[in-house]
Amino acid sequence: MLIKLLTKVFGSRNDRTLRRMRKVVEQINRMEPEMEQLSDELLKAKTVEFRGRLAQGAALDSLLPEAFATVREASKRVFGMRHFDVQLLGGMVLNERCIAEMRTGEGKTLTATLPAYLNALTGKGVHVVTVNDYLAQRDAENNRPLFEFLGLSVGINLPGMAAPAKRAAYAADITYGTNNEYGFDYLRDNMAFSPEERVQRKLHYALVDEVDSILIDEARTPLIISGPAEDSSELYIKVDKLIPHLKRQEKEDSDTFQGDGHYSVDEKTRQVNLTERGLVLIEELLADVGIMDEGESLYSPANIMLMHHVTAALRAHALFTRDVDYIVKEGEVIIVDEHTGRTMQGRRWSDGLHQAVEAKEGVQIQNENQTLASITFQNYFRLYEKLAGMTGTADTEAFEFSSIYKLDTIVVPTNRPMIRKDLPDLVYMTEQDKIAAIIEDIRERTAKGQPVLVGTVSIEKSEMVSHELTKAGIAHSVLNAKFHAKEADIVAQAGQPGAVTIATNMAGRGTDIMLGGSWQAEIALLESPTEAQIEAIKAEWQTCHDAVLAAGGLHIIGTERHESRRIDNQLRGRSGRQGDAGSSRFYLSLEDSLMRIFASDRVANMMRKLGMKPGEAIEHPWVTKAIANAQRKVESRNFDIRKQLLEYDDVASDQRRAIYTQRNELLDGGDVVDTINSIREDVFKVVIDSYIPPQSLEEMWDVAGLEERLRNDFDLELPITEWLDKEPELHEETLRERILTMAVEHYQSKEEVVGGEMMRSFEKGIMLQTLDSLWKEHLAAMDYLRQGIHLRGYAQKDPKQEYKRESFAMFAAMLESLKYEVISVLSKVQVRMPEEVEALERQRREDAERLARQQQLSHLDDQSAAAQEMASQTGDRKIGRNDPCPCGSGKKYKQCHGRLNA
């Protein structure tokens, strides 16, 4: 109550921020007449002037009013578009390390040009981040004329580009690209073997479009660069064939997992667990097909990988549905993004899940991968000196932006008042009733010329609605992951009178739905349109536009509520842009995923009490409140998952930063001879200490063990026993010094052969390779530790603290292993003179030829009988001299059994 009263008197923090910024907007507006008087050359010269002032020590923010006024004037001359005052406000919010919430259709792309220009003046680079390649390319090409007019360069960073092209894109003042590509480039740069291979500059300013999608929806998915691991595709196929024998348990006792079924499914956490009966059955089935010995337990250490395969196969069958979670296209399983409905080409599920789904669908199974490098978006974007973002729906996630990214959310007012009508939800008992009501609503609205956009949560649902519309004889377009290429065209024309468009989730974000259709798209279809043709198209569009407004504007139909209120708001936000008329309504049923998992019992009881009949809908504030509570529950759980992921990844992040810093110092620095000498001392001290403990009696020394260790691991043949026999005065300290001196001399003798320059290059290469190899193994070990760490909770220990403690112990051990491996490899390397190499190569060739002749003669002797038998088998069939020999040796017939028959 008190907070509400104080807000009423002093205004909210949002209001106070906007009040302060409006004063700067007035200042920019006062500069407009002066800017209009400038010639193009003088306006372009402003960029050089601003950079000069920055070089003399001026603060970047002191240039803001003049820089924004310059961009606004340049936009008027290049595009014929003037930034609204609210867009200037949005630009200021983005410059202040904040999230700007700007409604759909308010011109976020044009707003972004203001802070992008201002921050590009520093010369450190600006990264504009979009959700897909199409938007990155579109926005870069659309804004390029404006930035180039002002003397700034623009780059586009797309997947599959060659390193020189990427380097040029990053060297530009402003770079457009996708979040995935920026993240992967960062990881690839930290796997480079020379400074020239790296493409990114220091991360300065990131301007994230659709910031909620990138920093929240995708935050649970880490970016992983992986390499091939061992092949186990056969095992996936064998295990997959056993899963249909298992029966799902409808209700289970969560404590004992007793019941009729063989496995239970928890849809909330997306986990599958075997029951006691299921475990017994799967062990019997595995024994029957010979994968496991009879009487053996699936939980025994030897079968731990088999358990992993069974769990992956169960999850693939019970939790992952075709055309909802993935599609199968040209023999490949492609993941569908649950938030956008787009396919994610090249992305694969980890932990063997993708291979299990491939086995289930009967397509070719790709090898499992091993993690080489990984980072979450949360940690990648926090590497930027300055981060800002914009979206149409951020306010519901303001707390998360603030607590994780330290970004405040500012709601920017609309240019014109919003007049869209958001109608209350209608809830039906069954999905069939709901679909019938949706079809009827579409029929009524299209009859009066109102365009309708139907939002679905999956490809499967979009195709179901499409099928019903086809049956009802209603023409429509479908926009889902299967028709990704036509996305922009379908969305652009979704506002035509009476048009019906079905879209999965937020497919088509970034393209505005113009009421009356897009006249620009129609003009683009003509090769060289005349002025008269353009005017005729515009006049026709104006007629359609007015007709759609008269019919009530664009109507949005949501076929079910999403887990997040924000994504529902994004769907609604497609209507009512720039003060246009519009309406929206959600149709729900008790069979919807969200309702079934989180709210069905409460709402079903409510509907029964109200005496609901099949086909009837309930429309009540209580129901809407129950659904909102269910969504809040899911949002809260997802936030906890993301926060927990971040807390665990922060541990890995500190280690990643240490490794990458060390790696970059290696790449950028000179030789590493001092480092090698230093770690050689450390390594030999540890080795000698383990056989000759400090300040110990000679009787306690294991001299034979030390000699063997030095011989095996460091290629050092040292007669330590002989030294001790011949030199009684040799004590522990002098012995240590002598061993180290001999090791250094042994190494220097190699250096004298190849030369210092080559040895320095070799040292650096070995250090990088060893570091990468051990880091890869460390990441795998961290993954395993992470998977089982929650079990420490049963021992009354905090899993997070245990994870931190153990992971840092593992990290320290890895650094010690790095020192040991590097010195061991460098000590054992065989160095030869060029003439020695040539002589050895000649000897190797002669040995190989002699061995081949012996094998051939042996092969001919052993198989002469087989040749006679084969001749009788082939009968009259003539074998060509150059045909492959029927014995299966792989040689030509004339060089194998043909000789015996000759």
Curated annotation (Swiss-Prot):
Its EC number is 7.4.2.8. SMART domains: SecA_DEAD, SecA_PP_bind. Residues 891-902 have a biased composition (Basic residues). It holds the Pfam family SecA_SW. Gene3D superfamilies: Helical scaffold and wing domains of SecA (1.10.3060.10), P-loop containing nucleotide triphosphate hydrolases (3.40.50.300), SecA, preprotein cross-linking domain (3.90.1440.10). May bind 1 zinc ion per subunit. One of its GO terms (biological process) is intracellular protein transmembrane transport. Keywords: ATP-binding, Cell inner membrane, Cell membrane, Cytoplasm, Membrane, Metal-binding, Nucleotide-binding, Protein transport, Translocase, Translocation, Transport, Zinc. It is found in: Cell inner membrane; Cytoplasm. One of its GO terms (cellular component) is cytosol. GO terms for molecular function: ATP binding; metal ion binding; protein-exporting ATPase activity. ATP binds at residues 87, 105-109, 512. Residues 847-902 are annotated as: Disordered. It catalyses: ATP + H2O + cellular proteinSide 1 = ADP + phosphate + cellular proteinSide 2. Its cofactor is Zn(2+). Belongs to the SecA family. Monomer and homodimer. Part of the essential Sec protein translocation apparatus which comprises SecA, SecYEG and auxiliary proteins SecDF-YajC and YidC. HAMAP family: SecA (MF_01382). This is Protein translocase subunit SecA. The gene is secA.
